[in-house]
């Protein structure tokens, strides 16, 4: 499969990059509240609160949605009829689940955007980090000034994808000088191009 995949987390670093423009360049896997404004090729949502929000709309009827099954969904026939369920359920966060889905579908080159991991530093000494999510302060999300969740699980789940799919080349797009977790500091099948390099490669603007 020559086509590339784009896997979108919701970290602030991808703000301004339109998923619709990426759909013209490859297959887009995106997460959670993206559904409010866009229709990626695949929407991945594993949090029950987010899935129940999505169930209030007809999004799943007209678009591809991937999730973990939960008994709470038995009252929502639309979800039962139209969602593709992870088998077995990974118990992972949405972003790494989307990344693994792209790998399992056979993509050999995957661009990862919005996987920032680290929160937004509140002070120069970086003693505290606040939520880093473009949907902060909206329904089913923390407030923007809430303390960031520790990213260790997200990073380890990402690393598991890299280890399990060694024939896939991963490109984690970050701002120049952006945060690189020590757990992802190897060169075997991942690199960290800058946002500007990514935009230039695909002839995109933000």
Q: What is the predicted function of each stretch?
A:
Residues 1-206:
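Metal-ion/cofactor- or nucleotide/acyl-coenzyme-handling active-site neighborhoods
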